[in-house]
Amino acid sequence: MSLDLSKKVVTVRPDQTIVTKQNLPYYLGISTKTAGTLGLSMNLVVIPPGASPKAHYHKDFETAIYLLKGRVETRFGENLKESVINEEGDFIFIPQGVPHKPVNLSDSESALAIISRNDPSEHENVVHYEP
């Protein structure tokens, strides 16, 4: 990669939310649309108390998650038979093509996470999974 003095640093304030295919509220962060990225996205996701979004998998990208707040069980694999429980401060990696479904284990507090993916337009490459 060569030096490029024509590009600028971009700041994105996460003040716009969307509801994703997984039925979760996302605060839009870094993506092709917001920052002109070529191979990266990063958003803030909120899982409401007791909520569990639709099971899904990511067709062509990997996902890295940092759990800021809460306790979340992620069910994954064939028929979602496997699971892992993560707590505040954990990093989570989900390979492409792995079906999964997070569950907020709290009935009173939202779980918050930063989600980064190696796809700048990742919402278009999410596929629902029916176990």
Each predicted region: which residue ranges?
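Residue-level recognition of conserved beta-strand positions in structured domain cores
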Residues: 44, 57, 76-78, 104, ...
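A short, N-terminal "cap"/entry segment at the start of jelly-roll beta-barrel domains
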Residues: 1-39, 54, 128-131
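Conserved short histidine dyad/triad with adjacent acidic residue
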Residues: 43-59, 96
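Ligand-binding loop in jelly-roll beta-barrel domains
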Residues: 87-88, 96-123
